[in-house]
């Protein structure tokens, strides 16, 4: 089922009787082409393998429930304001994915580009932000170096006085950065991957690997062992 205004209205009128589970609870197959361990980043990996590369016989194995690991315990910040060029290009490409993710996955991940500000409390720290900001602009990434007056106008209530416990002498802002709801991201990728045929196996812990010489051919789990050509 594709989520839409029509489906919301239809289910609102019939007492929410027609909603289907966001993803299946399948029994594991005897073998898979790919087994991915971990239902956090693993869900995105499975989705793009299925969508971009046509690999559909995939299992994502999660020892708990989806979102119970690190993906459900993070700062929710989405940004590309890093110092190194390699990091900037990597995270800026990720930012572009975030901007269309809700549409691409047909699920509201609550991505909000409200901006992020890093505050400088001393001259060495401000110098680091100046260097980072210059590098960002060289790579075409938006950023602004702000003085205390500009910060005060941008963030009412921020204590920029000289008597503040942690005096603020400036800050670096990236307006395109923001936040996303991590639970919604997990559910969105799980639903989208499931619709492409990916099996999501929850409450299934990997306890070891099956090997043929130096080659890994499968995984041992708390729900039987599974063969795989790739891990």
Where in this protein do the model-derived segments appear?
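Glycine-rich FAD pyrophosphate-binding loop
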Residues: 50-72
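A short, glycine/Asx- and small/polar-enriched loop/turn
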Residues: 124, 154-168, 210-218
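Helical element adjacent to the flavin cofactor pocket in flavoenzyme catalytic cores
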Residues: 172-226, 230
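Short hydrophobic core segments
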Residues: 35-37, 61, 226-231
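Dinucleotide-binding Rossmann-like beta1-alpha1 core, especially the glycine-rich loop
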Residues: 75-157
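Short loop/edge segments at beta-strand edges and connector loops
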Residues: 62, 147, 202-204
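N-terminal Rossmann-fold NAD(P) dinucleotide-binding loop
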Residues: 42-43
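Extreme N-terminal leader/targeting segments of oxidoreductases
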Residues: 1-33, 48-56
């Amino acid at each position: 089922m594709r989520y839409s205004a029509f489906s919301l209205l239809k289910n609102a009128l019939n007492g929410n009787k027609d909603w289907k589970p966001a993803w299946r609870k399948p029994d594991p197959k005897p073998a898979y082409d790919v087994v991915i361990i971990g239902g956090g980043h693993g869900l995105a990996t499975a989705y793009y393998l299925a969508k971009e590369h046509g690999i559909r016989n995939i299992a994502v194995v999660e020892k708990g429930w989806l979102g119970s690991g690190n993906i459900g315990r993070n700062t929710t910040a989405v940004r590309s304001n890093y110092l190194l060029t390699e990091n900037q290009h990597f995270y800026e490409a990720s930012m572009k994915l975030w901007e269309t993710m809700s549409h691409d996955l047909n699920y509201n991940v609550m991505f909000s580009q409200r901006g992020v500000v890093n505050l400088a409390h001393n001259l060495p720290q401000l110098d680091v932000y100046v260097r980072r900001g210059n590098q960002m602009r060289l790579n075409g990434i938006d950023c602004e170096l702000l003085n205390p007056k500009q910060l005060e106008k941008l963030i009412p209530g921020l204590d920029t006085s000289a008597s503040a416990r942690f005096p603020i002498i400036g800050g670096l802002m990236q307006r395109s950065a923001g936040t996303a709801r991590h639970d919604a991201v997990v559910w969105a990728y799980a639903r989208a991957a499931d619709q492409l045929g990916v099996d999501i196996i929850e409450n299934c812990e990997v306890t070891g690997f099956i090997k043929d010489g130096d080659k890994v051919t499968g995984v041992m789990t708390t729900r039987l062992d599974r063969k795989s050509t790739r891990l």
